[in-house]
């Protein structure tokens, strides 16, 4: 057999998804069309890969770091002309298909130890988004991270990540995934989320995006403090009070209580007054 004798490796954070119902929900969320080119991150033994190849997608390209799994995947899908495989670290290898074309959608069971860097690679940052956004990403993440991504203002898990991701994309829950859905089962619960990146014309303009990033870094360094204190280094008290009054926000609030739209308006207010330069 292609994967005979291969066991999940802790250093690669390997947990095989074996729940057929979850695999079906992932595929449904991807909404695969005949002209889609799919990028799969961390295919493992190919359970999801098999489902993707059974869809109408024109191509499926997978990136796998584990050399032994690469060998097994090549054997398992040797007769699939629409399948291509890249061995290497998804954080550094090219993510284009074998023929150089970009993928249209990403479907992945992401290794939990690289979630943050991989999200940035796939989506970019507010001030440096990817040039060609994917139509959608269906990602299996640790539940805690998924909750932060889709959190609402005022919730305990609302963070700078919540603001950034919600200004880059629309994020919705697909389904919860308990530990028993994996082999071996992880110690944490997981969740499948759907991320639909905003079109380039819907993104923040570069200067405004840079200023939002600067404000988020400043404010969320001390998320328990009131805005009056966290933004004290950004503006003198008098100007800060005037801007808050103009925007209708209270400086008694804490960073996690402001919506993404309010952070944008706060940054826009600074832009209009030209009161502070964003960090480089």
From Swiss-Prot:
This is Ribosomal RNA small subunit methyltransferase A. GO terms for cellular component: cytosol. The gene is rsmA. The lineage of its organism: Bacteria, Bacillati, Cyanobacteriota, Cyanophyceae, Synechococcales. Keywords: Cytoplasm, Methyltransferase, RNA-binding, rRNA processing, S-adenosyl-L-methionine, Transferase. Gene3D superfamilies: Ribosomal RNA adenine dimethylase-like, domain 2, Vaccinia Virus protein VP39. It is found in: Cytoplasm. Belongs to the class I-like SAM-binding methyltransferase superfamily. rRNA adenine N(6)-methyltransferase family. RsmA subfamily. Its main location: cytoplasm. Specifically dimethylates two adjacent adenosines (A1518 and A1519) in the loop of a conserved hairpin near the 3'-end of 16S rRNA in the 30S particle. May play a critical role in biogenesis of 30S subunits. S-adenosyl-L-methionine binds at residues 15, 17, 42, 64, 89, 109. Its EC number is 2.1.1.182. It catalyses: adenosine(1518)/adenosine(1519) in 16S rRNA + 4 S-adenosyl-L-methionine = N(6)-dimethyladenosine(1518)/N(6)-dimethyladenosine(1519) in 16S rRNA + 4 S-adenosyl-L-homocysteine + 4 H(+). One of its GO terms (molecular function) is RNA binding.
């Amino acid at each position: 057999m292609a994967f005979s004798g291969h066991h999940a490796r802790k250093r690669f954070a390997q947990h095989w998804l074996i729940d057929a119902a979850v695999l079906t929900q992932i595929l449904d969320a991807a909404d695969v069309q005949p002209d889609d080119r799919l990028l799969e991150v961390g295919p493992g033994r190919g359970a999801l890969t098999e489902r993707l190849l059974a869809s109408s997608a024109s191509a499926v390209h997978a990136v796998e770091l584990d050399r032994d799994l690469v060998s097994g995947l090549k054997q398992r899908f040797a007769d699939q002309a629409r399948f291509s495989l890249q061995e290497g670290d998804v954080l550094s290898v090219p993510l284009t298909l074998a023929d150089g074309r970009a993928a249209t959608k990403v479907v992945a069971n992401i290794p939990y130890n690289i979630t943050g860097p991989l999200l940035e690679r796939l989506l970019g940052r507010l001030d440096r988004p990817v040039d060609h956004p994917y139509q959608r990403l269906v990602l299996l993440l640790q539940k805690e991270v998924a909750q932060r991504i889709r959190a609402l203002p005022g919730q305990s898990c609302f963070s700078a990540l919540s603001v950034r991701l919600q200004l880059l994309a629309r994020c919705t829950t697909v389904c919860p995934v308990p530990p028993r859905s994996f082999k071996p089962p992880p110690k944490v619960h997981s969740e499948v989320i759907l991320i639909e990146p905003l079109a380039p014309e819907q993104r923040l303009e570069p200067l405004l995006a840079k200023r939002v990033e600067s404000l988020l870094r400043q404010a969320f360094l001390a998320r328990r403090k009131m805005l009056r204190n966290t933004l004290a280094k950004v503006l003198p008290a008098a100007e800060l009070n005037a801007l808050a009054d103009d925007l209708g926000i209270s400086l008694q609030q804490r960073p996690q209580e402001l919506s993404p739209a309010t952070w944008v308006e706060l940054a826009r207010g600074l832009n209009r007054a030209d009161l502070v330069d964003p960090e480089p």
